[in-house]
């Protein structure tokens, strides 16, 4: 049964005068007359075009180097001066934003300190321009605030990520002079 399946779906790569090649699938039909006809037409085609026939399989594609690879894009390295300037803007925004709400009680300075430290570490070590703003530091902010049992961890992290989405990529483009 396996050989019947292979015979039904076999294909050959026909090379015509070594300058032109194409794939031709030749199904094998079970009736003797049809098989004879298929063989004769194939033989005629081979003789007419002076071709050489060789087996073609998908597994040979990778060996022949027909694999398409995406080009790698290397993001720029983080810029410490940008990280410092952006961290100051972030700290000012968070102090202003969180001071307006009673949810954070008397812990605003400590909450802003935790968020700012995590954000600055991310900017200094990982942020390399648009496309590299990750959600992980903001999850870390919420987790750290909750572990320290500070009020409003999720709300502070949400305010931080909202500000970062609105400002960090834009500020990077202004800083580096790119569009």
UniProtKB/Swiss-Prot annotation:
GO cellular component: chloroplast nucleoid; plastid nucleoid; plastid-encoded plastid RNA polymerase complex
Gene source species: Arabidopsis thaliana
Alphabetically ordered keywords of this record: Chloroplast, DNA-binding, Plastid, Transcription, Transcription regulation, Transit peptide
Transit peptide: 1-69
GO process terms (BP): regulation of gene expression; response to light intensity
Null allele phenotype: Misregulation of photosynthesis-associated nuclear gene expression in response to excess light, and inhibition of photosynthetic electron transport. Defects in embryo development. Dwarf pale plants. The csp41b-2 prin2-2 double mutant is embryo lethal.
Compartment list: Plastid, Chloroplast stroma, Chloroplast nucleoid
Phylogenetic placement of the source organism: Eukaryota, Viridiplantae, Streptophyta, Embryophyta, Tracheophyta
Function: Involved in redox-mediated retrograde signaling to synchronize the expression of photosynthetic genes from both the nuclear and plastidic genomes, especially in excess light conditions. Required for full expression of genes transcribed by the plastid-encoded RNA polymerase (PEP). Essential for embryo development.
Record-given protein name: Protein PLASTID REDOX INSENSITIVE 2, chloroplastic
GO molecular function annotations of the record: DNA binding
Transcription regulation in keyword set: yes
Highest taxon listed in the record's lineage: Eukaryota
Gene, per the UniProt record: PRIN2
Record note on quaternary structure: Binds DNA when in complex with CSP41b.
């Amino acid at each position: 049964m396996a050989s019947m399946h292979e015979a039904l779906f076999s294909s050959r790569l026909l090379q015509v005068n070594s300058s032109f090649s194409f794939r031709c699938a030749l199904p094998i039909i079970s009736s003797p007359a049809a098989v004879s006809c298929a063989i004769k037409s194939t033989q005629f085609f081979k003789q007419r075009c002076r071709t050489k026939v060789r087996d073609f399989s998908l597994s040979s594609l990778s060996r022949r180097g027909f694999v398409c690879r995406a080009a790698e894009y290397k993001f720029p390295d983080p810029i410490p001066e940008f990280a410092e300037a952006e961290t100051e803007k972030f700290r000012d925004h968070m102090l202003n934003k969180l001071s307006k709400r009673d949810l954070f009680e008397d812990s605003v300075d400590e909450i802003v300190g935790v968020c700012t430290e995590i954000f600055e570490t991310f900017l200094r070590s990982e942020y390399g321009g648009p496309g590299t703003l990750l959600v992980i530091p903001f999850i870390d902010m919420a987790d750290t605030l909750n572990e320290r049992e500070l009020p409003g961890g999720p709300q502070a992290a949400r305010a931080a990520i909202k500000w970062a989405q609105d400002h960090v990529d834009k500020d990077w483009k202004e800083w580096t002079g790119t569009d």
